[in-house]
Design a protein with these regions (language model features):
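Early extracytoplasmic/lumenal segment of secretory-pathway proteins
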Residues: 27-121, 125
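Extracytoplasmic ligand-binding site segments that recognize negatively charged/polar headgroups
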Residues: 40-54, 60-67, 117-119, 123-270, ...
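Extracytoplasmic/periplasmic substrate-binding proteins
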Residues: 269-338
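Conserved C-terminal helix/tail region of periplasmic/extracytoplasmic solute-binding proteins
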Residues: 405-497
């Protein structure tokens, strides 16, 4: 029994720590005079090119087309712009923990693209190379990031700090979004999908999925536990509401984690599965009627289901939502004071932040870039291209997105005219309205003590628990074991004869 439990615990711990990485690595030898830039990002997170002619995106202020991969385009652009050759060695990771494990085990990268909490962890551990002052020079026409980053995103990166230093000192945003439910409106009502309690709703027993990682499972669970507080008018209307919301949603006190463990065990009994990537396919196939998703994956699921004439909706729970970011950071262990590497890494960020490339990547992965484009209207035109109503449509509504593009939600230059259904579908996932933004909270980096407590909680929730096996199930297992023993014994007896 002890050996069994040890093996089970060891496996579960391996899952949590991500020491079984699934990396796709493109490692090549380069000449001494070529800058070697080692980049590591999420799988399928940069456009790979190979677009067909009918995939060309025609916008008012330009045409977007991905003939070759974004990485190859960058290498060519860098040589044409700076007269130096750079070779990008591109690797992929599946989870933040996998990336961190690789770094811990000695793998070296110059530029990586983790999520917000991992950026905070790497900042706290002093592993990041700060962005140079030149990177923030708005007078440089090639600094596409600082000239084009959304005013809203820029304020979030400036206001959030680790050890007294803002995120923006070390990180440049790439993609951002929220969490919520993708659901089948023919089965689940808008009201039912507007609360995290959907995960516990017995009406949808074994028909809903939740994410199979501790942070994305813990966030909605805390929201369920604190639902009454989060919806209380005095709390919502308080002067420092967002500060209080951030505190409540990052509560790691022992008592709340103990409660979360019990509630997650209840959720485990009600949901169809804990999943990382299969939830989208389960929605499209009809195995499940709702799935907790990151907004980008939600858009993908809605897009794919439409091809089968199945129309799914997006719901953001009324309690709150998780505001998340993926961003580019340079590693000290990779850059090592090499000015050429640092310049190439920052140029890579800028190249991806150029408006036409932003459109390419958004079109490829379905997520929302942190880039609004600044003076370049291409990104806004692309959003209108995707979601704007046709000229002859009569049933339309206005949908403001000025908070993202101009820092002012009432800016008349950034009000889309859309079909009403989009207010509950892809557009609302990619560019949520201000009421959603106001009730969003970033999950913070937890210290070692809190991490240990939370990881142990997750082991208790996700790993096989012998105490939960009923007497009837034990009898069934015993009978099965007995039958197996008889069969094996018979085979051995026959062979000996």
């Amino acid at each position: 029994m002890k050996k069994l439990m040890c093996r089970i615990s060891a496996f579960c711990l391996a899952v949590i720590l991500g020491i079984l990485p699934l990396f796709c690595i493109n490692d090549v030898k380069v000449a001494d005079d070529v800058i070697r830039l080692r980049v590591c990002s999420w799988e399928e997170y940069i456009d790979e090119g190979g677009w067909s002619d009918d995939e060309v995106i025609e916008l008012e202020d330009g045409t977007v087309f991905g003939k070759q991969s974004m990485i190859k385009d960058f290498e060519d652009w860098y040589y044409e712009t700076y007269g130096k050759r750079v070779k990008v060695e591109y690797s992929c990771f599946g989870t933040n923990e996998e990336l961190y494990s690789q770094l811990t085990l000695g793998d070296s990268f110059d530029l990586v693209c983790p999520s917000d909490y991992m950026i905070m962890k790497l900042m706290a551990e002093d592993k990041l190379e700060p962005l140079s002052e030149d990177f923030f020079d708005t007078g440089n026409e090639l600094n596409y990031y600082v000239k084009g980053v959304s005013p809203y995103i820029n304020s979030v990166f400036n206001e959030n700090e680790i050890n007294g230093e803002s995120w923006s000192r070390y990180a440049a945003g790439y993609m951002w979004g929220i969490t919520g439910f993708v659901y089948n409106p023919e089965v689940v009502t808008k009201e039912e999908a507007s609360t995290w309690s959907l995960l516990l709703n017995p009406k949808f027993n074994r028909q809903v999925t939740i994410k199979d990682n501790v942070r994305d499972a813990l966030f909605p669970t805390i929201a369920i536990l604190k639902k009454d507080l989060l919806l209380d008018d005095s709390f919502v209307n308080s002067k420092d509401y967002q500060k209080k919301l951030l505190y409540e949603m990052n509560d790691t006190n022992e008592s709340i984690i103990d409660e979360a463990e019990e509630r997650l065990k209840d959720i485990r009994q009600n949901v169809y599965s804990f999943e990382t990537d299969s939830g989208k396919a389960d929605l499209i196939s009809g195995k499940v009627v709702a799935s907790l998703q990151w907004s980008g994956d939600g858009v993908f699921a809605m897009d794919q289901s439409e091809e089968n004439d199945v129309y799914l909706n997006w719901g953001t729970p009324e309690e709150c939502t998780n505001l998340w970011f993926d961003g580019w950071v340079m590693l000290k262990s990779g850059i090592k004071g090499n000015d050429d590497k640092k310049h190439a890494a920052q140029s890579f960020i800028n190249f991806l932040s150029r408006s036409d490339n932003v459109v390419r990547n958004m079109n490829y992965i379905g997520y929302t870039s942190v880039i609004s484009g600044g003076d370049n209207p291409l990104v806004y035109e692309y959003v209108d291209y995707c979601y704007g109503a046709e000229e002859d449509d009569t049933d339309v509504i206005e949908y403001p997105v000025g908070f993202f593009f101009a820092g002012d939600d009432e800016d008349e230059n950034y009000i889309l005219t859309i079909n009403p259904e989009q207010a509950d579908r892809q557009l609302s996932a990619q560019y949520p309205q201000m009421d959603v933004i106001k009730r969003s909270a970033v999950m913070q980096y937890f210290d070692n003590e809190a991490n240990d407590r939370i990881n142990q909680m997750w082991i208790n929730v996700r790993c096989f628990n012998l105490n939960r096996i009923s007497a009837k199930q034990w009898r069934t297992l015993g009978i099965a074991a007995g039958v197996a023993a008889v069969i094996i014994g018979g085979i051995i007896f026959i062979k000996r004869r």
